[in-house]
Amino acid sequence: MTKTMLRALKGETLPTPPIWLMRQAGRYLPEYRATRAQAGDFLSLCYTPDLAAEVTLQPIRRYGFDAAILFADILLLPQALGADLWFETGEGPRMSTITDMAGVTALKGRDDIHETLAPVYETCRILARELPKETTFIGFAGMPWTVATYMIAGRGSKDQAAAHKLKDTDRPAFEALMDRVTEATIEYLAKQVEAGCEVVKLFDSWAGSLKGQDFEDFAVAPAKRIVSELKARFQGLPVIAFPREAGEGYIGFAEKTGADCVAIDNSVSPEWAAEKVQAGRTCVQGNLDPKYMVTGGEELVQATKRVVEAFRNGPHIFNLGHGITPEADPENVTLLVETIRGK
């Protein structure tokens, strides 16, 4: 097996870690901005397979990353379930809201999502054909808690208050929504794998707002269910889980859920994560602060070397602790890749 990304996910410690970046297809790249303008708007870009495949390929052509991640959005799934979704300029995503059991029961079933998502699967098929043979192809979905927070509040929020309120005041409706999203997520990811994805990543952007038993019930348990069902269908399928800002919750997350790799954010130090999470055996992905993609220079070189050094005694995939920002300088990404690969 020659793909370095897959070797790391199988638990191999490599002399040079594979590298890719969250949001590597994004607004920091002039070629992305040009293709997005051609699409007209963000959702049209997601749902036009040729253009979505093109923006997925752009950072691979430019930087030779070890992995490409499907260009899509975690909110395409709730849209496929029947939620209204639109993007406000400068404001981000907006959705119709679910506040009770009636809203949950009005959603489509898990087998009725594929008509809406068919263009995403076509994007996967194009990329499976066109990606370089050494590049690993990652599919993804949002985790149920994070997706549910948007479906309940109708927008992103700093504290996920609306979702916590529903969880605490109408537990049956909340749990029914989580179940619906979990089931649909499994079917969505299965179709991505059937269309050519080699790895799947689960993004739980708001996992950090779940504390104590809630973290176990609504971050760990859904991840475990998704991982086990996918691995039952696709033997040996590698899964990366990213319970962002989980802190101590990162410890043992891979073991509890069956994920092959845990992605970590930059609120924890690489040294702490190497000792507590990687522990010489668990694959860890991360965790350079995205700010260095803006500042660059010797600061970037030293911070990059620190991350590589911290994780060098176990399986490691180099990434940022969060998505690369629109302010990043493309030249700094070149410097990052050269630093890691010792060019």
Swiss-Prot record:
Keywords: Cytoplasm, Decarboxylase, Lyase, Porphyrin biosynthesis. Inhibited by N-ethyl-maleimide and phenylglyoxal. It comes from the Bacteria. Substrate binds at residues 23-27, 42, 73, 150, 205, 322. Transmembrane segments: none annotated. The record marks 73 as: Transition state stabilizer. GO terms for biological process: protoporphyrinogen IX biosynthetic process from glutamate. Pathway: Porphyrin-containing compound metabolism; protoporphyrin-IX biosynthesis; coproporphyrinogen-III from 5-aminolevulinate: step 4/4. It is an enzyme of class 4 (lyase). Coiled coil: none annotated. One of its GO terms (cellular component) is cytosol. Its main location: cytoplasm. Its EC number is 4.1.1.37. One of its GO terms (molecular function) is uroporphyrinogen decarboxylase activity. Catalyzes the decarboxylation of four acetate groups of uroporphyrinogen-III to yield coproporphyrinogen-III. Homodimer. Belongs to the uroporphyrinogen decarboxylase family. This is Uroporphyrinogen decarboxylase. It comes from Cereibacter sphaeroides (strain ATCC 17023 / DSM 158 / JCM 6121 / CCUG 31486 / LMG 2827 / NBRC 12203 / NCIMB 8253 / ATH 2.4.1.). The gene is hemE.
